[in-house]
């Protein structure tokens, strides 16, 4: 399995852990605000091979305690469970980032004990989900299933929404609060414009707006926080 990149140290990507972040290529979404756009279609021959990653992790035993696996969409990769098993065998805890579009794979990974923390991106309220994911006619049933699974599961998790001025409004967050009511934790993340973003001309909401949106959600999800300001 090819690994498209690795951030050798992060204190942010895995809450409460000293971790590295592993980037996998390929994604079924085309979110206009995606900051990892180069990973969407990266060639398999790019990056490092799996053995190189595992050798790095062996050397970092005792220095790192967690591995965050992100993309792209990691659950697109059929070889992912085998990679997670090998990382687990080295004694690491694993955080898995996902867009929730593959609930069967998500459930299998969690039930096998191959993910200790799941971070699921919630793009928007259902009415604007397809637009925000960049996929016309997107079927939402798999997304609903993944949300329902995490709300019931014993695995640690978070939901998070990257807030973009052109894509989100008060109604978005009122609906999100209803949908995700009772969630363990929820983050409103501030969009960061970068040159690699898929769609030019998008803007970050103001800090005041982010706080307003967080407060709209709080009655249904008390553990709501803002990231990126």
Residue positions per predicted region:
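Glycine-rich, highly charged phosphate/nucleotide-binding loops
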Residues: 46-56
């Amino acid at each position: 399995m090819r690994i498209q990149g690795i951030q050798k140290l992060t204190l942010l990507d895995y809450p409460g852990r000293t971790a590295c972040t592993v980037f996998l290529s390929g994604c079924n979404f085309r979110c206009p605000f995606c900051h990892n756009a180069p990973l969407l279609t990266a060639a398999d021959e790019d990056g490092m091979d799996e053995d190189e990653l595992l050798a790095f992790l062996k050397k970092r035993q005792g220095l790192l305690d967690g591995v965050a696996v992100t993309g792209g969409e990691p659950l697109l990769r059929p070889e992912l469970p085998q990679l997670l098993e090998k990382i687990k065998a080295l004694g690491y805890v694993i955080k898995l980032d996902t867009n929730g579009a593959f609930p069967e794979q998500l459930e299998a990974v969690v039930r096998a004990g191959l993910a200790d923390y799941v971070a699921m991106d919630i793009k928007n309220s259902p009415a604007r989900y397809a637009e925000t994911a960049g996929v016309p006619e997107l079927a939402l049933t798999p997304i609903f299933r993944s949300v329902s699974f995490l709300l019931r599961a014993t695995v640690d998790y978070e939901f998070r929404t990257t807030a973009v001025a052109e894509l989100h409004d008060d109604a978005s967050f009122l609906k999100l609060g209803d949908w995700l009511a009772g969630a363990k934790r929820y983050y409103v993340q501030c969009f960061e414009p970068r040159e690699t973003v898929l769609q030019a001309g998008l803007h970050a909401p103001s800090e005041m707006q982010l706080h307003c949106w967080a407060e709209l959600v709080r009655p249904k999800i008390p553990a709501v926080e803002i990231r990126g300001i």
